[in-house]
Amino acid sequence: MGSLKKRSVNLAGHATSLALEPEFWAALDRIAKQDAVSIAALIQRIDVGRGERPLASACRVYALQRAGG
């Protein structure tokens, strides 16, 4: 795994900075493409269902679940 890469996404009208390993960004990009949504829309979907879990952790878990892990 590489070092963290930050991206800024707009969630519910607010710019949010999210730091993930490049491998997780690549996985989320693939998922967004498969679902025909933007990366921001995908992360918004993850954000809504994450509960108390930090957003970065929720994104990693989501990517692993979608990968079958």
Question: Where would I find each of the regions flagged by the language model?
Answer:
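Glycine-rich, flexible loop/turn motifs
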Residues: 5-7, 42, 51
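C-terminal structural segments of small proteins and small subunits
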Residues: 48-69
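Aromatic side chains
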Residues: 14, 24-25, 62
